[in-house]
Amino acid sequence: MKDTLKLSVVLSLYTVVACLALAFVHNFTEPIIQKVKEQKSKEALQSIFPLADAFEDILGELGNVDGNIKIQSAFVAKKEDEDIGMTIQATGPTYAHATILVGITMDKKITSIKFLELLDTPSLGSKAAEEPFIGQFNNKSIQDNFSVGDDVVAISGATITSKGVATILKTALSLIDDYMNSRGGKAE
């Protein structure tokens, strides 16, 4: 009985020390991780609109999204106080899930798409982040249906990923379209 009690106390102490160490490491690394994410996000925005000198956050002005798709950010890209485009970042289900950043011109065309995260099957679903799949969206209207088989050529063997990407794009871009329409077709 005495050995059992001693073992329980020692095990409890190890557990407490491990939890405290984990909490310390988490509190130390969390701000660093957040800074790296913010820096990567800024770099991604700048790569879509390299001429932009500022990005105005408009996430709070967008409508709500139903379903599994989450909007993380939305910005108006500006150059010398002139709107030159917009970006929206959305996450949603594919075969696993994807986070996509989309650039949009002021005449409602897609400039480029960047996958910030794509956790689908390597060599199948991961082809969504490669040409020719990703390139087919360039210069498409944001009012496109993004229907796989009609407007979007699916990746062979990764139809679920293709449909997921198309759904994420359609949902995110419909919010941008509504936003622009509510301002007379302009971003501000």
Residue ranges and their predicted role:
Residues 2-188:
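Flexible, solvent-exposed loop/hinge segments and secondary-structure transition points
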